[in-house]
Amino acid sequence: MELKDIKTIAVIGGGTMGSQISELLSYVGGYNVTQWSRSDETVKRGIDAIADRLKKFYVEKGKMTQDEMNQIMGRIKGTTSIEEAVKNADLVMESALEKMDIKKDLFQKFDAAAPAHAILATNTSQMNITEIAAVTKRPQVVIGMHFFNPVSRMKMVEVVKGTLTSDAVVKMICDLAKKLDKEPVVCKDFSYGFIGNRVYRALRWEALDMVRERVASPQDIDKVLKIGFNWPMGPFELGDFSGAWGTYAISEADAIKEFGPEKGKLHPLIRTMVRAGYTGGRHGKGIYAFWDEVASKW
């Protein structure tokens, strides 16, 4: 199979990343997309989020007509059935919760229901591709395709090769990334966090230490990195936008398994925040609010 043979893509997960990936695939790639989520409510929320972004950032700014937006939205449909989502897919793109047992369960279902030629990809930012692939009968077509958040602005895509992933599939996913106007970098899967998040993990830990030590507020730390280092978003702004604080807490056991207890453990400030309900993302409150409402008063 070649890139030109990919016509229909299933996106599994309609949250912050899944809906952005669906938008990119339809808007930039021109693909037919079936977006799966667990309930009718979350399916609608994910598709509505795409429409809201297109309207706000393109139609209302004169960068896109309403007819063009309607065409993009017309290529995206939603479902609560995994079998329905993947049955005609040439590529399955998983963007669900960052827990290994959840991903293994999903990939077993993809393997059973997707066409024999379909490539099975995951948007994981850290999980081992070889371990995910081992639950399928087609490990040679299981691959990581990690988009960075926000998907529309960030050019980087990490293409993550499992031990048994074929070179042909790696090339095809790199070609797809380029078609979507992204810059692919190929890496091996035995680095937990791959390239970006392994480096970012160390930086984030230091930034969180500075907040805990009251060196500066999260807002000011972000300001230094955005203005001083020309980052589009600071680490705290990014965590609040994506809801990553909750994800880090959920995936702590996997991180410890890969990194060991010292490097893999959750930062205590994240643990305190998440326990108090400050997870960011669609839940609204993250570390900015936690600082303003709680930590700055300690």
Give the label of every model feature segment.
Residues 12, 20, 79, 95, ...:
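Structural motif
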Residues 1-56:
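NAD(P)+-binding Rossmann beta1-loop-alpha1 motif at the extreme N-terminus of oxidoreductases
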Residues 42, 56-59, 63-119, 127:
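Rossmann-like NAD(P)-binding element
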Residues 34, 183-184, 196-206:
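Structural/interface elements that position substrates and couple domains in central-metabolism enzymes
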Residues 119-189, 198:
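Rossmann-fold dinucleotide-binding core
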Residues 9, 23-26, 35, 71-91, ...:
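Amphipathic alpha-helical segments at domain termini/boundaries
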Residues 30-31, 87, 150-160, 232, ...:
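Acidic/polar active-site rim loop that often engages polyanionic ligands
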Residues 1-8, 29-30, 168-171, 178-189, ...:
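NAD(P)-dependent Rossmann-like dehydrogenase/reductase catalytic/cofactor-binding core
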